Swiss-Prot record:
<dbReference type="GO" id="GO:0005525">
    <property type="term" value="F:GTP binding"/>
</dbReference>
<feature type="binding site">
    <location>
        <begin position="8"/>
        <end position="15"/>
    </location>
    <ligand>
        <name>GTP 1</name>
    </ligand>
</feature>
<dbReference type="InterPro" id="IPR005225">
    <property type="entry name" value="Small_GTP-bd"/>
</dbReference>
<feature type="binding site">
    <location>
        <begin position="314"/>
        <end position="317"/>
    </location>
    <ligand>
        <name>GTP 2</name>
    </ligand>
</feature>
<feature type="domain" description="KH-like">
    <location>
        <begin position="370"/>
        <end position="454"/>
    </location>
</feature>
<feature type="binding site">
    <location>
        <begin position="250"/>
        <end position="254"/>
    </location>
    <ligand>
        <name>GTP 2</name>
    </ligand>
</feature>
<dbReference type="InterPro" id="IPR031166">
    <property type="entry name" value="G_ENGA"/>
</dbReference>
<feature type="binding site">
    <location>
        <begin position="116"/>
        <end position="119"/>
    </location>
    <ligand>
        <name>GTP 1</name>
    </ligand>
</feature>
<dbReference type="InterPro" id="IPR016484">
    <property type="entry name" value="GTPase_Der"/>
</dbReference>
<feature type="binding site">
    <location>
        <begin position="203"/>
        <end position="210"/>
    </location>
    <ligand>
        <name>GTP 2</name>
    </ligand>
</feature>
<comment type="subunit">
    <text>Associates with the 50S ribosomal subunit.</text>
</comment>
<keyword id="KW-0547">Nucleotide-binding</keyword>
<dbReference type="Pfam" id="PF01926">
    <property type="entry name" value="MMR_HSR1"/>
</dbReference>
<dbReference type="InterPro" id="IPR027417">
    <property type="entry name" value="P-loop_NTPase"/>
</dbReference>
<comment type="similarity">
    <text>Belongs to the TRAFAC class TrmE-Era-EngA-EngB-Septin-like GTPase superfamily. EngA (Der) GTPase family.</text>
</comment>
<dbReference type="InterPro" id="IPR032859">
    <property type="entry name" value="KH_dom-like"/>
</dbReference>
<dbReference type="InterPro" id="IPR015946">
    <property type="entry name" value="KH_dom-like_a/b"/>
</dbReference>
Length: 461
């Protein structure tokens, strides 16, 4: 697919134009210079033609971090087909802007000079100052007021192939409704794309999430720096691994409460958004620095969203911890609510054991989407209740008529009972353990609900 890159100095409106063309808020926008530090990508439709739109980090050399951002942006421009070079029409052009623009022209690609923030006649007069850039394709636009954008898109359309969007290309996100048929005793399972796995990368600031993403995709996709909070936007990247598409979302670092301000607060919300759209969470911990309460709170996000979970001990090569003791601490103490999660030690910077993590993602996804045959499930429940009978409810007999798995990702099991409210949480935990012993649900939450026969009302646990 052909690509269009938005490039220019910080705070010229690249992310605002990106959001406008994407028709939704994806990139974080702010008056603070340098808000976008990574490249965001999304498929868009330009005059009925498919294109990959890329929002790059600002071109700036004021410090080491922004030099890295600039290098990433220039690399993305070299791999793009069309360049929108954006400038701020509220200011007169400077030599730095001109130098960056000429650097883009050397790539010999279709390039447009896009002068943003042209909101009135006075701004339009000022835009003539950019004529010395020596480019034919100049577009005065105002993203805020949606002026001039159609003309820009029509120009770009001339360089795009006639590859029209099909309705089948758009994913169907219709809400799923659980249907229980009393007569058949069957539930309607949601459809899962078994060849596309969505993975969220979570963890507190500077534990190595961006380095891990780069190691996983073998490309410097996210800007990596020792400066805490380098990544602001969630950065999506997809790879193929053993014939499966794995889509990663590198979420913004999560700061301690009380220190979250402005962009960080919005980025924290974006972390929640990323997990809402993920199936598996990689909980990244800093093995060299050790673990703290904030790690536990972040882990709770994965539990809250009922995702598959893999605990990743990053920087293990710099750690002096004993693996068995660390595993015991994680499973029995700090993260006992994620006792089902496998623990993988890696070094993101060196790439050591990253291949093990990729294989584990496939395994956990298979567990996340597996369906237990109803006959086998009922045989297991019958044996479990015989070995450990259900407690009576104030002298009344409590009975499970049958069990059925009614959903995937995560797996959910319904127990059809005469007195569903009488099922104690400890007995649910007992049944969960029995199911895990017989079926491989490593890395996956297992949800059990109790329902009265002939009713959709449930008691979940």
């Amino acid at each position: 697919m052909q690509s269009i890159i938005l490039i220019g100095k910080p705070n010229v409106g690249k992310s605002s134009l990106f959001n406008r063309l994407a028709r939704k808020r994806i990139a974080i926008t702010s008056d603070i210079s340098g808000t976008t530090r990574d490249t965001n990508k999304i498929e868009v439709q330009i005059d009925g033609k498919k294109a990959l739109l890329i929002d790059s980090g600002g071109l700036d050399e004021s410090n080491e971090l922004f030099k890295n951002v600039k290098a990433n942006s220039l690399k993305a421009a070299k791999n793009s087909d069309i360049i929108f070079y954006m400038v701020d029409g509220k200011f007169l052009p400077d030599d730095e802007d001109k130098a960056f623009f000429y650097e883009m022209k050397k790539l010999n690609k279709p390039i447009a000079l896009v002068i943003n923030k042209i909101d009135n006649k006075k701004d339009e007069e000022r835009s003539w100052e950019f004529s010395n850039f020596g480019v034919k394709e100049v577009f005065n636009i105002s993203v805020t007021h949606n002026i001039g954008i159609d003309e820009l898109c029509m120009w770009a359309s001339k360089f795009l192939n006639e590859n029209f969007l099909d309705a089948d290309d758009e994913e169907d996100f219709e809400s799923y409704l659980e249907n229980f048929d009393e007569n058949s005793g069957d539930f309607k399972l949601k459809t899962i794309n078994e060849n596309h796995i969505k993975v969220g990368i979570i963890g507190r600031v500077n534990v190595g999430k961006s380095s891990l993403l780069n190691a996983l995709v073998k490309e410097e996709r996210s800007v990596v720096s020792d400066i805490a909070g380098t990544t602001i936007d969630p950065v999506n990247e997809s790879i193929m691994h053993k014939d499966k598409i794995i889509e990663f979302v590198d979420t913004a670092g999560i700061r301690k409460r009380g220190k979250i301000q402005g962009l960080e607060r919005y980025a924290l919300n974006r972390t929640e958004y990323a997990l809402t759209n993920a199936q598996i969470a990689l909980l990244v911990l800093d093995a060299a620095e050790g673990f703290n309460e904030l790690d536990e709170r972040i882990a709770g996000l994965a539990a809250k969203h009922c995702l598959g979970v893999i605990i990743v001990l990053n920087k293990w090569d710099k750690s002096e911890l004993d693996f068995d003791k660390t595993l015991k601490e994680l499973k029995l103490d700090r993260f006992k609510f994620l006792a089902y999660a496998p623990v993988i030690s890696v070094s993101a910077l060196s790439g050591k054991r990253v291949h093990v993590l990729l294989d584990k993602i496939l395994e956990v996804f298979a567990n996340f989407t597996q369906k237990i045959p109803t006959a086998k499930l009922n045989a297991l429940v019958e044996e479990a209740t015989r070995a450990h009978p259900l407690p009576h409810d104030y002298g009344k007999l409590v009975k499970i008529y049958y069990a059925v798995q009614y959903d995937l990702a995560p797996p959910k099991i319904a127990l059809i009972m005469n007195r569903p409210k009488a099922l104690h949480f400890s007995y649910k935990r007992y049944l969960q353990n029995q199911i895990r012993k017989q079926f491989n649900f490593e890395g996956v939450p297992l949800i059990i609900v109790s329902r009265k026969k002939g009713s959709k009302d449930e008691q979940e646990g």
